[in-house]
């Protein structure tokens, strides 16, 4: 709702500006320039009825959250509409719905509902596929399985709001890391297949080495991208570290900050060179799954620098992940994590 109200105000102001730009007096302005969008027009924008350009889509993504609503057993069992409403109320603009299961009716029973709930409430849904078999063994058989998965998903959602986008692979890891040519082949074949049913939907590809921005330059733009392509990259997806030089963060020294800004600059340079916008699909304020030895105060400092750096670069991001901040069983925000959450989503 708040998005629709702001949209009406902006368009109304733009109409006045256009009228006065050529010296038109107030009395000469037609009443139509003062009328906001009709309900139908508002709905078309708010619900993504028409295709959305990649740069416009990037500007809409804002700050998001990685969720396992369709990935884990608990995520599926505890999913509910109130969680989506709570996320929107808290300022979360998009969710990255991570999926590892087969594209079948069992998946669609929950995924359909989640996508519709997000669109109706005002959160952008991004479907992201894990494709573990292909990452572990990127042979032809496993490649065909990934293409087939996306064929089914693309057919299922071909008439869905253009706010829905397809994130083709959740970070290249394992054996796939050493075969960038196979990664590019995968993207070429998936995009070709998806474009048969979704010619103007946003498709998102990511570089190797766990979506490292430094390897964006290795990506080959799929021949059927059709002007509706973005790239995902990420860093600190499992949080910072007090001893790993690649993601070191202790007190926020200049060198530690430079590790962050260098990656952002790689992305900005690639965006400028290719005219393809990017998005950070995951970063974590603490090393929750590997020691969890950052205090709340330390997490706040890290989160503040990370958030401000990405916001200043105008690169949207998703935080990893929902269960660290939100109790899905009680539908309550986790009290002791609120200082970190509020630092990011303020």
Feature map (PLM): residue ranges:
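Positively charged n-region of N-terminal signal peptides that target proteins for export
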Residues: 1-4
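N-terminal carbohydrate-binding accessory modules
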Residues: 22-94
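Acidic-and-aromatic substrate-binding clefts and catalytic sites of carbohydrate-active enzymes
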Residues: 70-79, 100-109, 133-144, 173-177, ...
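An active-site-proximal structural segment forming one wall of the substrate-binding cleft
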Residues: 76-80, 84-94, 99, 104-130, ...
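Active-site region of glycoside hydrolase catalytic domains
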Residues: 147-248, 253-286, 312-313, 318
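Substrate-binding cleft of secreted/luminal carbohydrate-active enzymes
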Residues: 261-340
């Amino acid at each position: 709702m708040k998005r629709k109200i702001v949209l009406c105000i902006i368009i109304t102001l733009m109409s006045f500006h256009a009228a006065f730009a050529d010296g038109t007096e107030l009395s000469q302005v037609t009443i139509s320039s003062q009328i906001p969008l009709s309900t139908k027009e508002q709905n078309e924008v708010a619900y993504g009825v028409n295709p959305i350009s990649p740069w416009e889509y990037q500007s809409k993504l804002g700050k998001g959250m990685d969720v396992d609503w369709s990935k884990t057993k608990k995520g599926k069992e505890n999913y509910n509409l109130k969680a989506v409403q709570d996320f929107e109320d808290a300022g979360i603009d998009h969710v990255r719905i991570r999926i590892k299961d087969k594209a079948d009716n069992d998946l669609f029973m929950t995924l359909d509902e989640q996508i519709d709930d997000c669109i109706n409430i005002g959160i952008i849904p991004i479907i992201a596929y894990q494709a573990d078999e292909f990452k572990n063994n990127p042979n032809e058989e496993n490649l065909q399985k990934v293409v087939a998965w996306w064929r089914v998903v693309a057919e299922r959602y071909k008439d869905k709001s253009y706010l829905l986008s397809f994130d083709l692979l959740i970070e290249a890891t394992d054996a796939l890391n050493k075969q960038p040519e196979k990664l590019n082949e995968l993207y070429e074949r998936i995009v070709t297949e998806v474009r048969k049913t979704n010619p103007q939907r946003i498709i998102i590809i990511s570089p190797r080495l766990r979506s490292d921005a430094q390897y964006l330059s290795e990506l080959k733009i799929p021949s059927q991208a059709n002007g509706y392509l973005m790239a995902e990259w990420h860093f600190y997806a499992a949080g910072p570290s007090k001893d790993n030089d690649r993601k070191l963060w202790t007190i926020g020294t200049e060198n530690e900050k430079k590790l962050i800004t260098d990656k952002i600059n790689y992305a900005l340079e690639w965006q400028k060179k290719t005219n393809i916008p990017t998005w950070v699909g995951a970063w974590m304020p603490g090393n929750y799954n590997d020691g969890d030895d950052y205090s709340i105060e330390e997490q706040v400092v890290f989160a503040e620098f990370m958030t401000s750096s990405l916001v200043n670069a105008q690169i949207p991001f998703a935080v990893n992940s929902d269960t660290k901040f939100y109790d899905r069983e009680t539908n309550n925000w986790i009290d002791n994590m609120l200082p970190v959450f509020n630092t990011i989503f303020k």
